[in-house]
């Protein structure tokens, strides 16, 4: 019984060491990728390359890189012979660590048997079978699986929580501030501050069109009832009353743009505050997204890329861009200029498509070549 307890304690400690090494290596690999993206344009870090930053900042970047790459190498050495203990999610994390280490170790010797390497006393596959049997007989195996499940569950809950905060808090702040603070304040000071209700030609044109339609409705209703058409004085009186109503509507609508801008600023401030107070949770969210993306199959990745590109740069995307630009112009109180919209549609989707192709060529082709092949096949070989 004591021997069995000793085996269980040893297996539990070994599993905890594996998780600790994997977490340290994964965090270090993500740090190296962030340094590459921020300072080296998604290229490998080179100590001999002069950056357009102060010397102290470059020294700090290189120091972080050296520490992180050493952690990745140490974690990879510890986990090299324990792959059979890892679940699919942990294997994807290990593959990320390997890709980072291999990127900075071009002469790294492959773990596969070669003619220049001393043969192992026993086949590694046989050792893996023994290790699998040992883990199945390990009394602490269930506790290890439960601990791993709880860790992934906590990561998912934290990610969903911070994602909801990033979405709901700015929206709630925007609506509440606009309804109870910004709108009353703007309505109170708009008569004294002309810039809060600056005149808009499109509002005047809309008011004139409504007044013309109202006059035609009066004459049409009189003809339908068989009455005489109102005299010029009566018509002038009714049109004057309607013009006063339209002026009040135009004055109220002229302040909507200022209210929208101030509400958007308050929502942006709320978003920044949430980000500042949720830095640790944002790191967990980033890891959650990385695992979700790496967990997709090649067909799923290709399908998502094709769907995204067809929506924004596909054949029917101009209609969507037109609706989007009209909505933005109306939100900020600007007239929807047809020439600007046509120029935007003729240039921006082309730039966006070029960025997609460059990203596929530089990043996706290196990280997941099979996804690129699947993408070409699903996209008709293009």
Curated annotation (Swiss-Prot):
It is found in: Cell inner membrane. GO terms for molecular function: proton transmembrane transporter activity. It is a multi-pass membrane protein. The keyword Membrane applies. Keywords: Cell inner membrane, Cell membrane, Hydrogen ion transport, Ion transport, Membrane, Transmembrane, Transmembrane helix, Transport. It comes from the Bacteria. Belongs to the CemA family. Required for H(+) efflux immediately after light irradiation to form a rapid H(+) concentration gradient across the thylakoid membranes. Together with PxcL, contributes to transient H(+) uptake following dark to light transition. This is Proton extrusion protein PxcA. It comes from Synechococcus sp. (strain CC9311).
